[in-house]
């Protein structure tokens, strides 16, 4: 299987989400600092999601 940057982007996206599970729980339990970390992580998710969208579009356009 050849290298595909989409795999790395998707793995990064999953890692950001998985790494912040504890902070989400802490925020629900009342830790406001954890909420700040969650918001920061969600900005990273937004950015990575956009990169995934762009890469998918680029790969789709290369096929046609």
List each model region and its residues.
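Short acidic DE-rich linear segments
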Residues: 1, 61-64
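Metal-centered catalytic cores of metalloenzymes
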Residues: 3, 11-14, 38, 49, ...
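Short, surface-exposed loop/turn segments at secondary-structure junctions
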Residues: 28-36, 63
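N-terminal acidic leader/helix
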Residues: 1-23
């Amino acid at each position: 299987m050849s290298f595909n940057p989409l795999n790395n982007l998707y793995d990064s996206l999953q890692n950001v989400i998985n790494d912040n599970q504890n902070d989400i729980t802490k925020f629900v339990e009342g830790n406001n600092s954890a909420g700040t970390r969650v918001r920061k992580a969600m900005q990273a998710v937004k950015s990575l999601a956009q990169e995934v969208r762009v890469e998918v579009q680029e790969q789709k356009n290369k096929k046609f």
